[in-house]
Curated annotation (Swiss-Prot):
Coiled coil: none annotated. The keyword Signal applies. GO terms for molecular function: structural molecule activity. Belongs to the FlgI family. The lineage of its organism: Bacteria, Pseudomonadati, Pseudomonadota, Gammaproteobacteria, Enterobacterales. It comes from Wigglesworthia glossinidia brevipalpis. This is Flagellar P-ring protein. It is found in: Bacterial flagellum basal body.
């Protein structure tokens, strides 16, 4: 009897673990106050092979060049109209990581602001990067790496990927760090990646089990406050957070969600989605308009006729109505995919079908339309 109970308990544990999975707190949450800050700057790219801005169309490029040269001690008479093709005005963006120190380097993104055809082979001149407080936090400069390429000949153009944007790896040097009071805080606030009351309480319980009672408490479906344990002083906060973030959390199945992007027509379905039995018919209405010009040239013996040009328009409407298609109930992702593929609908049509199935109660999932 004892052997049977032990064997049964092992089977039950296997079933529970197969339906749930263990995640670390660091994978489910972020720490409030520990985040990136965005930086932005305006600069010039030089050294382009005739693919820069058309200076007549982008006067701010020449204005920026004049200002830069004047700061370097080079003066250009106001009457001279410079027609340059190897320079481009750009916007430079970057993310300032948390706790970064002066002298460290970060990556920057460079994007064309004017009419430049390509930034390939260009060099970004020194560009100050500012935060929302208008303070300079970094200086960017370097050669731009453009992933795309293109060719043009005889009026024909071939292009792969984007040529008007590029990246400079470690292209900016930090000149100022952001002040923070993180080391003085006695309460660490965790923020869930997704709203979930049960998960917030579950994480709080796991922290209290690990560090002791009343160490953590949730304030809402997304926020958990964690009090620095009495066994850790402020100088050991990093050790405390490291152990906190690695606490395992056994979470159950996630919500059934279908994400629809109306612009690209993409549909993403997670494994929790289930379908109930239903019948679907989806018709397609096609309207085709053809315009042509008919020329009537009279061919008479006496002459005197004139050429008549008359437009002709043909409108063709097709209504391709499909018969009802039965969809059986599906309990896993493979069955859901097979059932939806049996309809034979295109992605754009599938979005309308899923919305109708949701309204009819045949789809047990949340629809997120972007």
């Amino acid at each position: 009897m004892k052997y049977i109970l032990i064997k049964l308990s092992i089977v039950m544990i296997f079933i529970i673990n197969s339906a749930s999975k263990a995640e670390r707190i660091r994978d489910l949450t972020t720490i409030v106050g520990v985040r990136d800050n965005v930086l932005i700057g305006y600069g010039l790219v030089v050294g382009l092979d005739g693919t820069g801005d058309q200076t007549t169309q982008t006067p701010f490029t020449i204005q920026s060049l004049r200002n830069m040269l004047s700061q370097l001690g080079v003066s250009i008479p106001s009457g001279i109209n410079m027609q340059l093709k190897n320079i481009a005005a750009v916007m430079v963006t970057a993310k300032l990581p948390p706790f970064v120190k002066i002298g460290q380097k970060i990556d920057v993104m460079v994007s064309s602001l004017g009419s430049a055809k390509s930034l390939r082979g260009g060099t970004l001149l020194i560009t100050p990067l500012k935060g929302v407080d208008n303070q300079i936090y970094a200086l960017a400069q370097g050669n731009i790496l453009v992933s795309g390429f293109g060719a043009q000949s005889g009026g024909n153009t071939s292009q792969v990927n984007q040529l008007n944007g590029g990246r400079i790896s470690e292209g900016a040097i930090i000149e100022k760090s952001i002040k923070t009071d993180f080391d003085k805080r006695e309460i660490i606030t965790l923020q869930l990646n997704n709203n979930d009351f049960s998960l917030a309480q579950q994480i709080s319980d796991a922290i209290n089990t690990y560090f002791g009672k009343k160490s953590a408490y949730p304030t809402d479906s997304r926020t958990i406050n964690v009090i620095l344990s009495a066994s850790y002083d402020k100088s050991e906060k990093v050790k405390f957070i490291a152990r906190l973030q690695n606490i395992p959390i056994i979470i159950g199945p996630s919500d059934a969600i279908i994400v629809i992007n109306s612009r690209t027509g993409s549909v993403v379905i997670n494994k929790e989605v289930m379908l109930n039995s239903c019948a679907v018919a989806h018709g397609e209405l096609t309207v085709e308009i053809k315009k042509r010009t008919k020329v009537n040239q009279p061919n008479t013996i006496l002459g005197g006729g004139s050429t008549v040009v008359t437009p002709e328009t043909e409108i063709l409407i097709k209504n391709q109505g499909d018969s009802l298609q039965e969809i059986s109930s599906s309990t896993n992702l493979n069955e859901v995919i097979s059932s939806l593929n049996s309809i034979g609908a295109k992605p754009n049509d599938l979005m309308a079908i899923l919305e109708s199935m949701k309204s009819a109660g045949c789809l047990n999932a949340k629809l997120e339309i972007n």
